[in-house]
Amino acid sequence: MKKRIPTLLATMIASALYSHQGLAADLASQCMLGVPSYDRPLVKGDTNDLPVTINADNAKGNYPNDAVFTGNVDIMQGNSRLQADEVQLHQKQAEGQPEPVRTVDALGNVHYDDNQVILKGPKGWANLNTKDTNVWEGDYQMVGRQGRGKADLMKQRGENRYTILENGSFTSCLPGSDTWSVVGSEVIHDREEQVAEIWNARFKVGPVPIFYSPYLQLPVGDKRRSGFLIPNAKYTTKNYFEFYLPYYWNIAPNMDATITPHYMHRRGNIMWENEFRYLTQAGAGLMELDYLPSDKVYEDDHPKEGDKHRWLFYWQHSGVMDQVWRFNVDYTKVSDSSYFNDFDSKYGSSTDGYATQKFSVGYAVQNFDATVSTKQFQVFNDQNTSSYSAEPQLDVNYYHNDLGPFDTRIYGQAVHFVNTKDNMPEATRVHLEPTINLPLSNRWGSLNTEAKLMATHYQQTNLDSYNSDPNNKNKLEDSVNRVMPQFKVDGKLIFERDMAMLAPGYTQTLEPRVQYLYVPYRDQSGIYNYDSSLLQSDYNGLFRDRTYGGLDRIASANQVTTGVTTRIYDDAAVERFNVSVGQIYYFTESRTGDDNIKWENDDKTGSLVWAGDTYWRISERWGLRSGVQYDTRLDSVATSSSSLEYRRDQDRLVQLNYRYASPEYIQATLPSYYSTAEQYKNGINQVGAVASWLIADRWSIVGAYYFDTNSSKPADQMLGLQYNSCCYAIRVGYERKLNGWDNDKQHAIYDNAIGFNIELRGLSSNYGLGTQEMLRSNILPYQSSM
C-alpha cells in the first residue's frame, strides 16, 4: 500500500492541487532546468577501493605524513569531487588499523560535489576514508531534485546518506527565488528516509518569519512517513472559519492512519476526523470515524436534545480469500439526519437522501456462487419515514453453459424484510428462477432465445395496520405464491459499408435490433412493495426484460422492442459518431395489479416508450453526447440530457450541459420519502457549464455554474483561480452550493465557501494543476463527454 505525502508539517498552509500529466509534465521539466544534474559517469562499488586522483598547479609534502596542494586543486575519488584554492592532505596511521586515516583541509573557494549534493564555502574538511565532509559558512544544492540552502556548517555523514546543517536553511525554490524557506538551529536531511528534520524551526515567507516550532519535518520525496501534514483553512457560511491540522501515522507497511483535528468556529468545538487504511490477506479496506463532542449550533436549533455528540462512521472493505471467499462491506452511518447538511464529507452528501449499511460474504467456484448479505438504510429526509432493510439475504447462482447448444442458469434468493416502524408490513420472500438460453451468433448477427420460470413465495406479517387504513387501495395477504413464466427472443444484425464516396477510409455500420418479450399477468396487489422501483429507460434499457428493479413488482409483457444503431468509424477504427433510436410497442397493457401505480389504470397499448442516444466526436477537441427518453404512460419526456465539450488538453476544456427529469418520472423512480420532497415537486430542469483554462503562464481558472429554470435560481456555482510554479502553488476559490431545503420557509438553503490554499512545490514529484479534480468535487460533478 502506497501513500504519497507531498507535504510540509505545521506551516499553516494547505494543499489542494493534485498531479496531472500535460501541463504538469511541462512545468516539471522547466523546474528541472534550474536544478544541477550529475554529469560524470556514475561509479559503483566500494569507494575506499577506488584510487584518489589529485590535480593542482603546485604541490609539496612530507611523505607519507602530509602534503600541500595549491592552485586549482582538484581531488576526485569515485563519485566525489573536492575543489579549492589550497588543500592540505594529512595521513596518519591509526593504531590497530590496517589502513591509514587520510583527511584533507580545504581553503578558499571550496567546492564539493557528488551525485547527491553540492557544497560551497570558504573552508572545508573531508575524511577520505569515511567520506565525511564539512564546509563552513557556505551554501548547498541538492543534485537531481529541488532543494538548497545555507548554513554556518554543512556536514556530509553516513556515506553521504545524511546532510547535517548547523544554523542552516532549506527551501525548494530555484536559485534566485527565496519565496519561502525554513531556518533551524540544526537540519538533518536523510536521503534514505526522504525527510529533512529541523530543530528550532522558523518558517519564513521572503525575509519575514511567520511561524515557529521546536521541531519540524520536511518530506523531500514520495516515501511514506509519520508526521503532521500541511494544515488547511477555509471560511464557509455554515461553519465560519475552519482549520485542519492532519497527522499521518505510518503504522506498518500494510496500514496507516490520518488523524485530523478540524476546528469549526461556529460549532465552537473541534471535530476529530480519523481515517484508517489497511491491507490484509482478507482484502483492503478503509475506516473513517469523525467525532464532534458538542455542537452549539445544533444544540441551539434542538434545545430539547441537550448536548449532542455528532459523528460519522464509514467502513469500506473488499477482498478475496483463498480464491473462493469474498468479503465486502459498504457501511455509512451518522448521528443524525442533518449531518451531511452541516458538514462536508467525501463519504456522503446532503443530496444522497440516505446512507447504506451493507455487509456481504460470498463463496464462488466454477459454475456456482452464493452470497449472504444484510442491507439497511438510514433515511435523512424525515425521521418519521419508514425504510426496509434486508436482514439477511441469500443469493445463489448456478451456471451450466454449453449444455449441447444451450446455456442454463438457476438463480435463487431468500430474504427477510424488516421495517424501521413497528406498524409496517414485514415479509420473508423466497424466489427461484431457472433459465435456459439458446445463443446463436456469427460475425454479422446474433439471435438469443431465452425461457425462464419465476417462482416466488411471500410470507407477510404485521398487516393489520396497513389493511385497516382506508387510504391503501390494496389489501395484503399473509401468504402469496406467484409463478410467472417468461419467454424472450432477441435478434441483432450488423451491416457494414465503406464510405469511400463521402469520407475515404471511413466505415459505417447499421445495427437493427428486435426483441419480443412475453410475461403473463399475475395480480400482485396482495404483495407489499418492499424493494421495487421503476428502472430508467435509456436506449439499452429498452431491451431489459424488467420494468421494475427488485422482485416485488414483475410487470406483464406482450411487447416488441425495436431499435437501430448506426456507427461511423474513421480509418484508425476510432468511433466518431453513433446514434440509437428505439421504441417499445405493447400489444397488451403492462400490469402488476398494483392500484397505487397510476398508469396501470390507463389501459394503454401501442408505442409507449421511446428512447434515443447519440454521440458525436466532431473533432479531436470537440465532442457531443445526448439522450432523451419519452414515456407516454407519464405523458411527458421522462429524462433528457445533452453535453457539448471542447477539450484542448487535460487542463483546458469548456463543457455546456443540460439536464431534465420530469416530476412524474422522479415520483415513479425514487422512493416516496425522497421523490415527494419539496425541491423535486417540479422536477429537474437545469442548464450549466464547467470550464478550466490556462489564462496566462502558470495561471489557470476553473469554474462551474448550473441554473435551475424551474426555480429560477442557481443550483451550483464555483470559481477558482490557480497559480502554479516550481516553488509554490496557490489556489483561491469560491463555491455556492445547494445544501438542503427549508420546508417552513419553502426555499432552498445554500452554503457559501471561500478557500485559500497554498502548496510548497519541489518536495515531491507533484506539479499538477488539478483542475479536473476541482470540477469533479462539485455537487454536480464534471464528467467527460469525450
Swiss-Prot record:
UniProt KW Signal keyword: yes
Single GO cellular component term: cell outer membrane
PANTHER family registered for this protein in UniProt: LPS-ASSEMBLY PROTEIN, LPS-ASSEMBLY PROTEIN LPTD
Underlying gene: lptD
Subunit structure: Component of the lipopolysaccharide transport and assembly complex. Interacts with LptE and LptA.
Family membership noted in the UniProt record: Belongs to the LptD family.
Predominant location category: membrane
Localization, UniProt: Cell outer membrane
InterPro entries on file: LipoPS_assembly_LptD, LptD, LptD_C, OstA-like_N
Post-translational modification, as annotated: Contains two intramolecular disulfide bonds.
Function text: Together with LptE, is involved in the assembly of lipopolysaccharide (LPS) at the surface of the outer membrane.
UniProt xrefs under Gene3D superfamilies: Lipopolysaccharide (LPS) transport protein A like domain
Keywords (A to Z) from UniProt: Cell outer membrane, Disulfide bond, Membrane, Signal
Name this protein carries in UniProt: LPS-assembly protein LptD
Lineage: superkingdom: Bacteria
BP GO terms, sorted: Gram-negative-bacterium-type cell outer membrane assembly; lipopolysaccharide transport
Organism for this UniProt entry: Salmonella choleraesuis (strain SC-B67)
Position of the signal peptide: 1-24
Disulfide bonds: C31-C726, C173-C727
